[in-house]
UniProtKB/Swiss-Prot annotation:
Record flagged with keyword Ribosomal protein: yes
GO molecular function, one term: rRNA binding
Record family assignment: Belongs to the bacterial ribosomal protein bL9 family.
Protein name listed in UniProt: Large ribosomal subunit protein bL9
Any Gene Ontology CC annotation: ribosome
Entries under Pfam families matching the protein: Ribosomal_L9_C (PF03948), Ribosomal_L9_N (PF01281)
Gene: rplI
């Protein structure tokens, strides 16, 4: 068994900075040549500490950025113009992709459509809410104002 230090996240093995033991062939033929790991040395322990400190700083910065974006999203209603009939029923439904595009068009930053959760199908004009998971610890509620247009 070879003791190595991961420099990148490897699925099923660990995150960057973790010290793990793997079979010699896996380390020698896959992890080391691709730069996913370094052989473990006492000097490598210092490198592990610097990798972990950098990861913690990145995580802290991403949480702060997500909280700032959540505050901005929660405070500003987003207007969605969709095709609708005279009675107010939509031709189709509002999808997460539509919400993400409307948020970006409103100048509130870009969000991934896969992070948008619409609790119920939106099939008529009116005011609704949608949830956005910006980070695993941070989410925001967006006020949607669906109006007939186009």
């Amino acid at each position: 068994m070879a003791k190595i230090i991961l420099t990148h996240e490897v699925t099923g093995l660990g995150a960057a900075g973790d010290v793990v033991e793997v079979k010699n062939g896996y380390a020698r033929n896959y992890l080391l040549p691709r730069g996913f790991a370094l052989t473990w040395t006492k000097g490598g322990e210092k490198q592990v500490e610097s990798i972990k400190a950098a990861r913690a700083a990145r995580e802290h910065a991403s949480v702060e950025a997500a909280q700032a974006q959540a505050a901005k999203l929660s405070s500003t209603p987003v207007r969605l113009e969709v095709k609708a009939g005279d009675s107010g029923r939509l031709f189709g439904t509002v999808k997460a992709e539509d919400v993400a595009k409307a948020v970006e068009a409103a100048g509130l930053g870009s969000i991934d459509k896969r992070k948008v959760e619409i609790p119920a199908h939106i099939k008529s004009v009116g005011k609704y809410q949608a949830n956005v998971r910006l980070h695993e610890d941070v989410s925001a509620v967006i006020d949607l104002n669906v109006v007939a247009g186009k």
